[in-house]
């Protein structure tokens, strides 16, 4: 599914997205392709299916749970930032804490979040024990 088809699907599921959120979701693919070429955090076969295998599945959480403004959500073992990054776009007034033990993954998460202008994401390398 190309990003344009994905945008049609996401707008069907979430029709009230702001222009900024639409732009962030559209930019997500290019940022992950760029960073995945430098630091392999998503399987090379999965990067072509980023929206269907990672983004849409992450957003499925929003169909059963709505995060309230001012709430804090922790994504333990975030890997490349899923489900945290897509949910942070969808819920800009909710704070998301993404943690993973692998430093290169957290670097990508921080770079993608910065590239999208997400101010509600904090990612750190740590163990969750």
Could you tell me what each predicted segment is?
Residues 1-69, 74, 111-121:
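Class I SAM-dependent transferase core
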Residues 59-129:
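Conserved SAM/SAH cofactor-binding pocket of Class I
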């Amino acid at each position: 599914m190309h990003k344009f088809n994905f945008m049609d699907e996401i707008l069907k599921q979430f029709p009230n997205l702001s222009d900024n959120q639409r732009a962030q979701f559209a930019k997500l693919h290019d940022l992950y392709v760029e960073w995945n070429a430098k630091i392999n955090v998503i399987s090379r076969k999965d990067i072509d299916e980023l929206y269907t295998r990672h983004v849409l599945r992450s957003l499925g959480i929003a169909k059963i749970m709505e995060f309230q403004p001012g709430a804090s959500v922790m994504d333990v073992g975030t890997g490349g930032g899923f489900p945290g990054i897509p949910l942070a776009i969808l819920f800009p007034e909710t704070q998301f804490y993404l943690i993973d033990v692998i430093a290169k993954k957290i670097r990508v998460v921080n770079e993608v979040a910065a590239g999208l202008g997400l101010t509600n994401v904090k990612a750190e390398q740590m163990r969750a024990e």
